[in-house]
Amino acid sequence: MHARRVRPDTGPTDQRRLFAAILSAILPGLGQAFNRRRRPAAMFAIPSLVLLGVIWLLFQLNSSTMLLAHAIAPGTLQLLLVINALVLVWRLIAVFEAFVDRRYPGKPGRLGGVGLLVLIVLVTLPHAAIHFYGASAFSTFERVFAGPGGDATGGPEDDPGSATGPKPGVGERVNVLLMGIDAGPSRTQALTDSLIVISLDPVGRTVTMVSIPRDLVDVPLGNGDTFAPKINSLLGWANRHESEFPLGGTRALEDAIGALLGVPIHYYAKVDLAGFVTMVDAVGGVDIDVARPLSDKNYGGFGVGPGWSITVGPHHLDGANALAYARIRRSTGENDFTRAGRQQEVLIALRDQAVEGGNFLFSLPGLLDAVGDTARTDLPADRLPEFAALAEEIGGERTTQVVMTSPMVKSGGKNHPYGSVVIPVPKRIAEMVAIVFTKPGTPPGPWPTPKPTPKP
């Protein structure tokens, strides 16, 4: 007769081990406290509580948008990725140490082994997600943010030899040229579909937006010469004629707009139209209150058409429809000037949707994916927190909107060699600049807000 080997019942012990491990997964040290091991409990809990306290304090002292802006700055982002990895290791050690309770010698049973493995996976997953999004953000910076030599690796209509322009001093206005690039398959060359100068006053906490007509001709280049064709072709023209524009098309366009307005253009931001659609979708769409119906049976492209229309009243628009609203100009009573006003309207709505209600945090993954392949800027990444604070603080009531229309420009007539164009009137432009580009801390003078779709 052979003796039968009896295996001990490890179920109750495994359950206790797992419960302690789960507690330490929630907060390192809790499992050790459950196991009545005070010294290990304090060793794991105190650093964890200090870290949580620092995070809580940061959220109390800063808005979520500001914190996010600080966090995604390249230097800070690299540090946070390292901290994330260290916290993961710390939590896993705490989980394993709580699971291996010395009061219960012997190997854990199947329940304990499988349970511990599942718990390790659950603890690791959020840290892996943080690393994925962090690495994605860092990759985006490399593609979008050009360094001092303009060496960003992505974005529309890249300039092989672009160079940065003059930079603002401390407390000075920051002037950014925003370019919407139309490089669709029907185009033989990329054109700037929209040109908007955005001027930030960091002292007075105000914003001035000036839309430049894309059909503007005879624009000064800032070197004594004049660009005779339409301004929306300068970017592509300069990039194809490197001998005449050795600094590239973007710098040529910055210099031209700066000379036109008589103000320095410090930075640029380029977004192609397909990327704009994706950006709007990434923040969940934008809210627009349409004052006059728009309709164009021939409009199409970027997921809309043929034909597009919109009725009077509030609308929540996705990316394709927001782009259509900003671009349509062949509707009754509409033209390039009313179109420019609608473009500013959509930009403000995009800003509102991105920063209000903490939506920016949830929109970040899609937004990063959108801008990574479709945008480029030489804005310094280390000033992102400052710009984020301005974007969050400055609403529509502190934004001055200008569309460069008559008397700042005049018609080129019916027989102009470049077709339907407008010609700048320097004196009137200078008068506008004096009113809305005031010294830092001085509010811009009153200017009639453009009404892109006034009620009939």
Name each region found by the language model.
Residues 47-102:
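Membrane-embedded alpha-helical segments of integral membrane proteins
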Residues 12-51, 88:
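Hydrophobic, aromatic-rich membrane-embedded alpha-helical segments
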Residues 35, 39-48, 55-56, 64, ...:
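Membrane-interface alpha-helices
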